[in-house]
Amino acid sequence: MSIPTVINAAGRAVMTELNGKPAIPFRGVGKYRPSGNRYGPPIPSCTDFPPDGNKVVTTLEEALLRCGIRDGMTISTHHHLRDGDLISNRIFEIASVMGVRDLVWFPSASFPCNEPVIKYLEDGTINRIEGSMNGPLGRFVSEGRMKGTAVLRSHGGRVQAIQDGEVKIDIAVLVAPSSDSFGNARGTGGNSACGVLGYAKADAMYA
């Protein structure tokens, strides 16, 4: 069944529905006033962790299992490591081996180093990407080869989507150059110092 389209304020035909959700076409600057309330983040609890506060696990696979990874989840990542981010690739490699399907990848951005993710778009591990897509991955999406519909989000628009409940993060994988055993991370130290980790703040709060 085809999805209806409308002409937005920029004169472009756009869909009224994206990935099964209603879409609000651009009406012009200052023409749309949102309603409702911000989405509340979950309440954290120390009861979910060992008495000594040590949250360390030995592998990313174990971490994903403990988070209850399953079909259709939204997994977020940040891009502070830029073109050196190999962890995002590993997330979906693990998910593919587990047989997990139709994930939504919600990165703050992706880079040429994430080209291996194309394999997991093709085999159905990932349904779609909602974020900034660059390099070979951006080309793949632009050619219409992704199963779901891509949603390109600015950095600020991404945070807005999180806080307004438009996107609900199931698992946030937040890479950091260094961290203590309780999970207090920083962008200095280690072999991959990258500076402040601001892009990951909303993910840490709302996942």
Locate each region found by the language model:
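Conserved alpha/beta enzyme-core scaffold
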Residues: 2-207
